[in-house]
């Protein structure tokens, strides 16, 4: 057996060096440090000691005893600590002290050393006659043990003296080992001739030695060392046994790294699936399904979860969570920190609105001293024009719109681009339908109005008529005690234009308009188009910051780099400040009017945000198509205080019909639901009505009018539904239904029949059967009933049977006799009344 150090033995047996040194000392092997080596003889002694003590720890022993030469009896003896003492007292042949065992083991080892050099050791083996004598003695002693014992012997104390199963050293011969075994057997048999128990055990040693044959020692291997480790583990540091030894198991020497529970931070977005959540927590989907099941939720791995449920799961499994902010990218990119910049006063942005041919563009043309009208088809504005005008008292930015449609479109997209509205009204024409619509849009956006009464140079001009008509539309002039400035102008002669500009600048001073002139630019798209050879072209109004050529910009769902900029005069510029309209090139597509324009430092982020906005826009469009239908309108009614509001846009063929319908609908308003007609007018439903409906979440109603082609196309795009009527009462009834849809229906009981009990019969199948006469209404088999006695309800339930003569009947009418069986009730008496009723829903009415 190769030499091994104490440290190596401690490492292979997974024991501390100090504990191993104490055990070696208790076995008579003196070692002082882990570097000391163990010789083959010491290793052999160590194995003998361990195996010897190991055998004495056996708690159960089964002994086979021959009774008459043919039959055998198995004696099973179990020994516990408290029982062992009694057995030792009762049996005089039992070994008295464990120290005797140690003495015998020492004698055996001495004899092994003595006979090591002898050559004729094999002649010492006992003959067969001695073996027979021993068997007879065993049988004689075993009989009285079985006969006289006052308790059942389930285990016999056993102390194994020798069982050398050590591994050998390469230098020892097999014959020497066999000689040692046989010499030990002889010495021990002579020492215990007076003890029957040890004779039996010595017999077992002989049989085992014969089976072992001439096997020699082999080199120790890791399995045997691990077995040695298991043996050493059964002793404490003083060499005493710890407890019952089990069969030695092969111990693999390996190192298991301690692993702490990993706490993960899980990002939860709305609609996360079970499989996605499992992947983020690095667990199997079945574990999350199990947690959901314990929470009372049946789910599959592909099922979507709301954020609250996902949070509960993450916390239940010991992880942390963060909620995914869908607008995180947009907030990080679009929100600009301007805390270090100072605000400066800026020019007002003025939108000119009014009816067709009332002189909007002519007035602006005179102000700019250019001939823009000549370039427009038919003298009517086709596109939005944005112009910056310098005056002696400051600059003004004008937006010339085609009517008011673009203004509405911008408001529908949440863009607040206009500061002041100039309402142009022809003095010879007065207030027209588009004039009223312009007033409605300006008030909806809460923008101050300055009225320009145009064409006062004409002989038929009547400014007072214009003032009177506008006052009827709640546009009260300052001369009448209102807050609206009226200025008489002539776009042809230029009369009053200076006063108009002064009124606009005065209004802007009241508003105290300010903006940041530094930092990344922000603005709004006024108009956009696709030009041949230039690509997408967008007219942008800068609202904050400084827009420079080469900036990366994001406009709604479109992005790009500013490749060129032109001002309102068509000249190339390199930068533009607040309240400056510019024309830019370089976008990926044509943005929509009213889209916000922001400058982003990273072009990659701009592209990513544009794709995200496009996806959100598609989802919002699908949801909007359903929300704008009249049938679901009560689900989307806005609240003003505690009232719910139904918004309506009303268009009719004549003014009288529109006024009549308007008054009728306003009278429908109650404390719970209010009708708000946000716009009304004469003529066909136009695209401006559609954009206003989208912006205000209103329903469009047409009385004897239809929508034009442009409005139909826009309505199809935005998912707006038109409702056409030619009878006023049908229109009012439908609006009533839309308003009543929010009110929950009432449940009402209605008595449909009464039957009087004339006689009571007994039935083996139904119990008490009441012979009745229907005295009122009709008795139906399926309806609930009440039993009345002296006009007091004593039972409420259902009918079990209803018969007319011997036939089953579904109903029995007034004046006919019938047999009635009441379910689960047998105390029916003569003179009782059976009342049949039904529960109906009654819708609340306004």
Curated annotation (Swiss-Prot):
Pfam family, one: EF-G_D2
The UniProt record lists the keyword GTP-binding: yes
tr-type G domain: residues covered: 345-512
Coiled coil: none
Composition bias, Basic residues: 207-219
Presence of keyword GTP-binding: yes
Region G5, annotated ranges: 490-492
Region of interest: G2: 379-383
Region (Disordered): 198-219
The entry's keywords: Cytoplasm, GTP-binding, Initiation factor, Nucleotide-binding, Protein biosynthesis
Family listed: Belongs to the TRAFAC class translation factor GTPase superfamily. Classic translation factor GTPase family. IF-2 subfamily.
Record protein name field: Translation initiation factor IF-2
């Amino acid at each position: 057996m190769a030499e091994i150090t104490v440290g190596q033995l401690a490492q292979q047996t997974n024991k501390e060096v100090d504990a191993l040194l104490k055990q070696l000392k208790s076995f008579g092997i003196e070692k002082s440090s882990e570097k000391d080596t163990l010789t083959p003889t010491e290793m052999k002694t160590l194995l003998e000691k361990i195996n010897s003590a190991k055998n004495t720890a056996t708690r159960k022993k089964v002994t086979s005893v021959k009774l008459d030469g043919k039959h055998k009896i198995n004696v099973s003896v179990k020994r516990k600590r408290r029982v062992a003492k009694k057995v030792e007292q009762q049996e005089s042949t039992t070994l008295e002290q464990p120290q005797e065992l140690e003495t015998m083991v020492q004698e055996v080892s001495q004899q092994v050393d003595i006979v090591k050099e002898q050559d004729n050791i094999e002649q010492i083996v006992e003959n067969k006659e001695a073996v027979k004598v021993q068997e007879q003695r065993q049988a004689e002693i075993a009989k009285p043990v079985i006969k006289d014992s006052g308790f059942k012997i389930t285990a016999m104390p056993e102390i194994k003296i020798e069982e050398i199963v050590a591994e050998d050293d390469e230098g020892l011969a097999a014959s020497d080992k066999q000689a040692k075994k046989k010499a030990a057997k002889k010495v021990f048999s002579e020492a215990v001739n007076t003890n029957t128990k040890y004779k039996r055990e010595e017999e077992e040693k002989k049989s085992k030695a014969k089976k072992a044959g001439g096997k020699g020692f082999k080199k120790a291997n890791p399995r045997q060392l691990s077995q040695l480790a298991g043996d050493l583990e059964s002793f404490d540091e003083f060499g005493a046994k710890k407890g019952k030894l089990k069969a030695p198991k092969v111990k693999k020497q390996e190192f298991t790294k301690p692993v702490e529970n990993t706490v993960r931070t899980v990002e939860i977005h709305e609609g996360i699936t079970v499989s996605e959540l499992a992947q983020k927590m690095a667990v199997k989907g079945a574990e999350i399904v199990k947690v959901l099941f314990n929470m009372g939720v049946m789910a599959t791995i592909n099922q979507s979860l709301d954020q609250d449920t996902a949070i509960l799961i993450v916390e239940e499994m010991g992880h942390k969570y963060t909620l995914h902010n869908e607008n995180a990218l947009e907030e990080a990119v679009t929100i600009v920190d301007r805390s270090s910049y100072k605000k400066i006063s800026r020019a007002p942005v003025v939108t000119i609105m009014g009816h067709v041919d009332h002189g909007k563009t002519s007035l602006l043309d005179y102000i700019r001293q250019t001939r823009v009208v000549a370039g427009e088809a038919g003298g009517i504005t086709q596109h939005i024009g944005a112009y910056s005008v310098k005056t002696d008292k400051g600059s003004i930015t004008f937006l010339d719109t085609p009517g008011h449609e673009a203004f509405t479109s911008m408001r529908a997209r949440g863009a607040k681009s206009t500061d002041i509205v100039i309402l142009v009204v022809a003095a010879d024409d007065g207030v027209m339908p588009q004039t009223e619509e312009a007033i409605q849009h300006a008030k909806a956006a809460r923008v101050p109005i300055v009225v320009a009464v145009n064409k006062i140079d004409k002989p038929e001009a009547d400014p007072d008529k214009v003032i009177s008509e506008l006052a009827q539309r709640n546009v009260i002039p300052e001369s009448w005690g209102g807050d609206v400035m009226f200025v008489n102008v002539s776009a042809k002669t230029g009369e009053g234009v200076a006063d108009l500009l002064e009124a606009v600048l005065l209004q802007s001073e009241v508003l105290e308009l300010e903006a940041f002139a530094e930092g990344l630019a922000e603005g709004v798209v006024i108009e956009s188009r696709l030009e041949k050879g230039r690509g997408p072209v967008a007219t942008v109004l800068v609202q904050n910051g400084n827009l420079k050529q080469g900036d990366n910009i994001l406009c709604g769902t479109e992005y790009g780099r500013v490749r060129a900029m032109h001002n309102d005069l068509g000249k190339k510029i390199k930068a533009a400040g607040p309240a400056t309209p510019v024309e830019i090139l370089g976008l990926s597509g044509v943005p929509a009017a009213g889209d916000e324009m922001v400058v982003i430092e990273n072009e990659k982020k701009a592209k990513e945000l544009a794709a995200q906005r496009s996806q959100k826009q598609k989802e919002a469009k699908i949801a909007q198509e359903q929300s704008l239908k009249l049938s679901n309108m009560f689900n989307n009614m806005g609240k003003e205080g505690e009232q719910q509001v139904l918004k309506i846009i009303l268009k009719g063929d004549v003014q009288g019909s529109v006024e009549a319908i308007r008054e009728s609908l306003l009278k429908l308003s109650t404390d719970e639901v209010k009708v708000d007609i946000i716009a009304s007018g004469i003529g066909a439903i136009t695209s401006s009505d559609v954009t206003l409906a989208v912006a205000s979440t209103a329903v469009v109603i047409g009385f004897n009018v239809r929508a034009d082609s442009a409005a139909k196309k826009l309505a199809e795009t935005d998912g707006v539904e038109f409702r056409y009527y030619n009878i006023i009462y049908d229109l009012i009834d439908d609006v009533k239904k839309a308003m009543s849809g929010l009110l929950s229906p009432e449940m009402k009981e209605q008595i449909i029949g009464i039957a009087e009990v004339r006689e009571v019969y007994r039935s083996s199948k139904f119990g008490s059967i009441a012979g009745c006469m229907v005295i009122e209404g009709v008795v139906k088999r399926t309806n609930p009933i009440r039993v009345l006695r002296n006009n007091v309800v004593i039972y409420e339930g259902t009918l079990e049977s209803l018969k007319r003569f011997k036939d089953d009947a579904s109903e029995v009418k007034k004046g006919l006799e019938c047999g009635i069986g009441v379910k689960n009730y047998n105390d029916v008496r003569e003179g009782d009344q059976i009342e049949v009723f039904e529960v109906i829903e009654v819708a609340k009415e306004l």
